[in-house]
């Protein structure tokens, strides 16, 4: 008992020496005792203990951009310049501001991603976007109203006026595939835009109640979607940078369409879209030995519909125009694909 009493007395004396208990306070925190012991240890070792003042602490900001600038001011550039440009363009931001370096653009991208994360989630549904655009046009017409006697053109689609006829295009088609690539591209562009105009005029000639129906909206949205799908193809044709294999296949398709040989045009389309290569995506070597069918793996036999999403879209748009061409410019049933199915 004497040993226990002496230990209690020693502990009590230690607390009094440390000044842990002030007036009207019956307890203390163990962290305070540890802090006092640490200070006493430093004093015995000859170190000077500088008290930390709360006023010297930097104020924390609720703005994540300011916190990023303070904490990661010299963050290394972890993305390539091409990736930074791609991400900025996806978010509708300029790829470079005036006087901005590559590192500054990278830092700007990080701030944008922190403030507005995930602008576009997943792949966009093009058909739904076209339908929403048609619905928005109807809403604008309802809100804006219409004057009596005014012609209703709110529901009409844009028509490409090519100022040409099918007879003139058929005459031009005789010179397709003769070696003049620039002339072939001009004829292809003119004919595809002519078909888009024919399709739009057909849809615009419908009654108003048909345009407003579910099926009518779907048909209008399909035409708008096809037009947007073909824009990359028109751009390549205008800039003369369409790949040679794609250009050759499309030339054959257009030539057969102008001759109203729709079965042959469909065969040429399948040859371009699907191909007949044993490795349609373009595998060139498996293992250490060349395969027996390797000589067939070149651009003419590759399935172009598998190359990328842009090619898949304008190939699909081309097939829709083939159907429209057969519908408006019929021929013998033996030369048609799915005769009377339209």
Swiss-Prot record:
Detected in brain, heart, liver and skeletal muscle. SUPFAM superfamilies: Functional domain of the splicing factor Prp18, PRP4-like. InterPro entries: Prp18, PRP4-like, PRP4-like_sf, PRPF18. GO terms for biological process: generation of catalytic spliceosome for second transesterification step; negative regulation of protein metabolic process. It is found in: Nucleus speckle. One of its GO terms (cellular component) is U5 snRNP. The modification N-acetylmethionine is found at residue 1. Keywords: Acetylation, mRNA processing, mRNA splicing, Nucleus, Spliceosome. Heterodimer with PPIH. Interacts with PRPF4 and with the spliceosome. Part of a complex containing U4/U6 snRNPs. Also detected in the cytoplasm. Participates in the second step of pre-mRNA splicing. Down-regulates the expression of potassium channel subunits. This is Pre-mRNA-splicing factor 18. The gene is Prpf18.
């Amino acid at each position: 008992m004497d040993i226990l009493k002496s230990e209690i007395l020693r502990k009590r004396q230690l607390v009094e020496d440390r000044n842990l208990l002030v007036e009207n306070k019956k307890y203390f925190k163990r962290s305070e005792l540890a802090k006092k012991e640490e200070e006493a240890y430093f004093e015995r070792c000859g170190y000077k203990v500088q008290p930390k003042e709360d006023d010297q602490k930097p104020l924390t900001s609720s703005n994540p951009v300011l916190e990023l600038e303070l904490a990661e001011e010299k963050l290394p550039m972890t993305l390539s310049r091409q990736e930074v440009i791609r991400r900025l363009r996806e978010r509708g931001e300029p790829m470079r501001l005036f006087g901005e370096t590559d590192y500054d653009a990278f830092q700007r991208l990080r701030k944008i991603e922190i403030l507005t994360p995930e602008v576009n989630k997943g792949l966009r549904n093009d058909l739904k976007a076209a339908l929403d655009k048609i619905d928005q046009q109807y809403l604008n017409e309802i809100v804006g109203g219409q004057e009596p006697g005014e012609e209703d053109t709110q529901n009409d689609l844009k028509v490409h006026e090519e100022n040409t006829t099918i007879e003139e295009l058929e005459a031009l088609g005789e010179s397709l595939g003769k070696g003049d690539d620039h002339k072939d591209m001009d004829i292809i562009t003119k004919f595809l835009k002519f078909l888009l105009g024919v399709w739009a005029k057909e849809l615009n000639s419908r009654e108003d109640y048909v345009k407003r129906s579910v099926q009518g909206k779907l048909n209008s949205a399909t035409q708008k979607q096809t037009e947007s799908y073909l824009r990359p193809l028109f751009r390549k044709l205008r800039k003369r940078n369409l790949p040679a294999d794609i250009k050759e296949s499309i030339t054959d398709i257009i030539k057969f369409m102008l001759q109203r040989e729709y079965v042959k045009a469909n065969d040429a389309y399948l040859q371009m879209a699907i191909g007949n290569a044993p490795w349609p995506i373009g595998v060139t070597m498996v293992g250490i030995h060349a395969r027996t069918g390797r000589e067939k793996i070149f651009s003419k036999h590759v399935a172009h519909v598998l190359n990328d999403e842009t090619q898949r879209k304008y190939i699909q748009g081309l097939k829709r125009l083939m159907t429209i061409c057969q519908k408006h410019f019929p021929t013998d049933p033996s030369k048609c694909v799915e005769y009377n199915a339209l």
